[in-house]
Regions:
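N-terminal alpha-helical segment
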Residues: 9-13, 45-49, 87-91, 127, ...
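Generic structural signal for isolated residues within well-ordered alpha-helices
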Residues: 16, 32, 94, 130, ...
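Alpha-helical ds-nucleic-acid-binding substructure associated with the helix-hairpin-helix region
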Residues: 21-22, 26-97, 152-154
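C-terminal accessory module of base-excision DNA glycosylases/AP lyases that mediates lesion recognition
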Residues: 84, 88-90, 103-175
Length: 175
C-alpha cells in the first residue's frame, strides 16, 4: 500500500533526489543524505557545505534545487502550513515557481504527500513504460493516448500509477 509522507519538506527533497535516476540509486543517496541529519530542516540544509552534499552523491544542480526548496519553505510558511487545504491548480502554480521543481516533482508530491487520488505523472518514464507494456504500445506514447488512459482511470489515476510502477519494480516507491 502507498505510504504518505506528511513531512512536506522531506518529500520535496526526496523527489529532487529521485529525479532522473533509478529507484535504487535514489534510495542510496537518500540514505546518505538523511544520515547527515535525519531531522533535516530548511535552515540546517542551507548551512551544509556544498562539498559535503556532493560527497553523498548530489549533483551541483540538485544541490541548488534543494537549496531553492529550503528558501521557499522559509519564505512561505503560511502557504506550507495550509497546503493540504488548497486545490491542485493552486499548489501547482505556487510550487512550479521554485527553480528545479517541475510537473514530475509536483506530481510525486501530490501523490505521496497530499494523497491526491487522480494524478497521472505522464512525464514519468516508469509510468510510460508500464502503460506501454500493459497495452502493448510502442514508446514514446503520445499525449493524446495518455489523455485517453487518464480519462479511463479517473478518478483513480494515482492508485493505477502506483500499481503500474509495481508491475515494473516490486519495491514500493515513496517520496
Amino acid at each position: 500500500h502507498m505510504i504518505l509522507n506528511s513531512n512536506y519538506y522531506h518529500a520535496l527533497l526526496n523527489s529532487i533526489i529521485g529525479q532522473q535516476i533509478s529507484v535504487s540509486a535514489a534510495n542510496a543517496v537518500k540514505i546518505r543524505f538523511f544520515k547527515l541529519d535525519k531531522n533535516m530542516t530548511p535552515k540546517k540544509l542551507l548551512k551544509i557545505d556544498i562539498r559535503t552534499l556532493k560527497k553523498i552523491g548530489l549533483s551541483r544542480q540538485k544541490i541548488q534545487y534543494i537549496k531553492n526548496i529550503s528558501i521557499f519553505f522559509i519564505e512561505n510558511k503560511k502557504f506550507i502550513n495550509k497546503i493540504d487545504q488548497y486545490d491542485e491548480s493552486v499548489i501547482r502554480s505556487k510550487l512550479i515557481d521554485i527553480k528545479g521543481v517541475g510537473n514530475w516533482t509536483i506530481d510525486m508530491f501530490l501523490i505521496f504527500s497530499l494523497g491526491h487520488s487522480n494524478i497521472a505523472p505522464r512525464g514519468d518514464l516508469g509510468f510510460n513504460k508500464a502503460i506501454s507494456k500493459l497495452y502493448n504500445k510502442k514508446l514514446p506514447l503520445n499525449d493524446k493516448y495518455l489523455l485517453k488512459i487518464y480519462k479511463l482511470w479517473t478518478p483513480y489515476n494515482s492508485m493505477a500509477t502506483w500499481y503500474l510502477w509495481r508491475s515494473l519494480d516490486p519495491i514500493p516507491i515513496s517520496y
